Amino acid sequence: MSENKCPMHHSAGGTTNRDWWPKQLRLDILHQHSSLSNPMGDDFNYAEAFKSLDLAAVKQDLLALMTDSQDWWPADFGHYGPLFIRMAWHSAGTYRTGDGRGGAGSGNQRFAPLNSWPDNVSLDKARRLIWPIKQKYGNKISWADLIVLTGNVALESMGFKTLGFAGGRVDIWEPEADIYWGAEDKWLDDKRYSGERDLEDPLAAVQMGLIYVNPEGPNGDPDPFAAAVDIRETFARMAMNDEETVALIAGGHTFGKTHGAGDAALVGPEPEAASIEQQGLGWKSSYKSGKGGDAISSGLEVTWTSTPTQWSNNFFENLFGYEWELTKSPAGAHQWIPKNGAGKGVIPDAHDASKRHVPAMLTTDLALIFDPDYEKISRRLFENPDEFAEIFAKAWYKLTHRDMGPCTRYLGPEVPAEEFLWQDPIPAVDHPLVDEQDVTDLKLKIIGSGLTISEVVATAWASASTYRGSDMRGGANGARIRLAPQKDWPVNQPEQLAKVLKVLESIQSEFNKSGKKISLADLIVLAGCVGIDQAARNAGVEVTIPFTPGRMDATQAQTDVESFAVLEPVADGFRNYHPTQFSVSAEELLVDRAQLLTLTAPEMTVLIGGLRVLDTNADQSKTGVFTARPEFLTNDFFVNLLDMGTTWKPTSKAEDRFEGVDRVSGQPKWTASRVDLIFGSNSQLRALAEVYASSDAQLRFIDDFIAAWTKVMNLDRFDLR
């Protein structure tokens, strides 16, 4: 056999479908993280495994590691704490409020692209340092939990009192395909900006491969005023206000140093591009020893404080105590040092006790005193170190727990007793739950209320479909659909919503007078179930819709209006709601929403078909309602969509609205959106639609619709899992 001839027929090589058709709808994001990629098996319960963990023993091992410097990657100042804080920070710091994606909740820093981002240089070493501890405790602690816990122990080992720690983060086992990190194809590009400096939604970092901002200033321009603008925008998109932002930057930069000992061109490729013998490590440097005092990461060479392994107020002392002038690191990066040679000998060397240095600051550090609003906060925290410590503790806890959902999911002995507004609190159940007879009585009340099938189904869907699997926010529990801001969202049809809620509140009030109680949150879901039950009966099928009580009603005081505003759908294909044209198509937005709802492609398909015939469009239009008998739970949507007797033509310049006409007579039959027609256009979705359009599919359609509906209604019922 020729040496040049490959003996294998590659199963995954060659040109892909997306190479041929780059705009092909990506349905693969609906089928991630399945049992096929997870080695733990379906019977593994991480929460139960974590409960058996000796957390104190893990923390003791981590504490010992902090000062156990390894020759292959020596600890700065003899302490790994600052490196581990950066590891935890950069794990959590990818979170963005726009879609709830990113964050520390899945251990995604282990995989591409995050493991190879320019901002994460050397964090590959940090994870290898904690591998022996992960190995020791095995599946009782996830990588996601261990990374955050290590950051906490690092802070505690250097004299800081943290607010607490919660376990419960479940690892993923493959890179996330659903997260849009930006359209750039080069590291540190910033095509994400338009206009004067408008950052693309939902992104929360200024350049590809950065966690937040460029520490040298916007695009490397050392302008502290401009840097403040970027800081405020990016931290706000991670749910942090100005006070939290200042505390996080100042608190984080109380410890450790940056690394820019030499020419960054001498640093090798990132982990995903490194050679196989590097064994998953990257950024191998040929500058001298490449480690310790010769390390290069960001290219900046900054140590902020004289006590870089102890909690102190020295960051603010130095920030306010000197006038600063621009200089460059040995690697050529912009940074700042005190004017007129001040501060000489104040800063210890990280690896040579005989050397001393001057304090240094990043452009983004100086933004904290150049920006007037940041300066006021910085000065207050400088003058009140106890307040600084308290705000940093709370902000750090929020940073590292923001994407975990409600505190009912939190595990372990160190969970704080205090519940915070950003956790979207819901009162605990304080009454016996309704029994089967109560549910039957309530169903009869709903049926006799005068509310239509469409109204109750649309309201229940609006309540439950706010859920985001990315950060486990939203959902039907809490009945926040009756509160600001959700009650006023156009997609929720405020007038119809107010009508439905008034009727349901009356039923609730009357029932609760009997001595038993049902929450409005439960009643909204139950009403939706009643609507589906009636619609199935209209179609000649008797069904039982699963309903599990146990939801409670949140108050307006427990609901941060600004925080919940980001959950408002800009589009919702399930309700044919597309008020604005975007650069991405309506069908792409549908798939994105389906992914946030943790739906598979079949579940998304059957829900669309059912919601259309139940007449639940947000604008009450007949777009996509391919049936002559609305409010009958039939497979008519699929039957009529796939009818070759209909031809379609766009009726809008944007080609987002269509008319279906009789192929022979030309008479109008239906109107449709792109979301409707994609189920006949996309080959994979058409294959699913054909299943439900078949003559023997009516019962399967109803069963599958009910299963998918029940899943959505219970997405935030963590107590049932």
Swiss-Prot record:
A GO MF term: heme binding
Enzymatic reactions: H2O2 + AH2 = A + 2 H2O; 2 H2O2 = O2 + 2 H2O
Binding site for heme b: H253
SUPFAM superfamilies the record matches: Heme-dependent peroxidases
PROSITE patterns per UniProt: PEROXIDASE_1, PEROXIDASE_2, PEROXIDASE_4
Enzyme class: oxidoreductase
InterPro entries per UniProt: Catalase_peroxidase, Haem_peroxidase, Haem_peroxidase_sf, Peroxidases_AS, Peroxidases_heam-ligand_BS
NCBIfam families: cat_per_HPI (TIGR00198), PRK15061.1 (NF011635)
Oligomeric and partner information: Homodimer or homotetramer.
Name recorded for this polypeptide: Catalase-peroxidase
Originating species: Shewanella baltica (strain OS195)
Gene: katG
